[in-house]
Amino acid sequence: MMSDALRAVILGIVEGVTEFLPVSSTGHLLLAERFFDLGEGNFWKSFAVLIQLGAILAIVAIYFVKLWRIALGMFSNPGDRRFVIGVLVAFLPAAVIGAAAGGYIKAYLFNPWVVCFSLIVGGAILLWVDQLDLKPHEYDATTFPLPMYLAIGFAQCLAMIPGVSRSGASIVAAMLLGADKRAAAEFSFFLAIPTMIGAFVYDLYKNRADMTTDHAGIIAIGFVVSFVTAIIVVKTFLSYVTRHGFTLFAWWRVIVGTLGLIALAMGR
């Protein structure tokens, strides 16, 4: 039987690898729970959300200098203030819909069938967008027009369906609205900070009864593993997509979703 520590390490790796790639971390965690006996029980369902904080802090660590400069200039620099407003505007749709319909979404959509279909459809869309002859005109994620930030925020709401991918929805929307691949990916990172912190705080409060000091060590393991893994993945990801695009991730989604459907059809 798998030890809790090993389970925490595996889930931390899955979270760190998939959170910022356009492949759906939630979808992969749900499939891992279903097919590999990982994450059963209320605690492990909450654990999957709690270790996202490690991935969030990886983004803060990578972009610390830029984020600190923006924080210091927010009240004196119009450009910095506008970017902060843009991130908040993009975050707002998901916050409202998540608060209003989060329970319904988890009750009816968090199942492996939905995940597999979402992975395949999302992969096909990502592949299509990546092959389009787009003419980008936005090369800096901190200077998008405010309506563009809002549109990306609405697109991110689709990621409440497990398997869609928060970063994938944000990246596709940004590219269709004129961002180049690197800027689209970077804004998905910035938008992840308030979005994932909100999900973390909400889930921590909602499931506080399942959290005890007995779980502190397991959560710490998953947190550290997701943090380290996410740092490695984000740095590699930006360099890769700038040169090669998103085709690899699109096909990964399609393959994982297809294999998942086959396994489900066979009664797994």
Language-model segments: residues:
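Multi-pass membrane proteins that catalyze or facilitate reactions on polyprenyl-/lipid-phosphate substrates
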Residues: 1-268
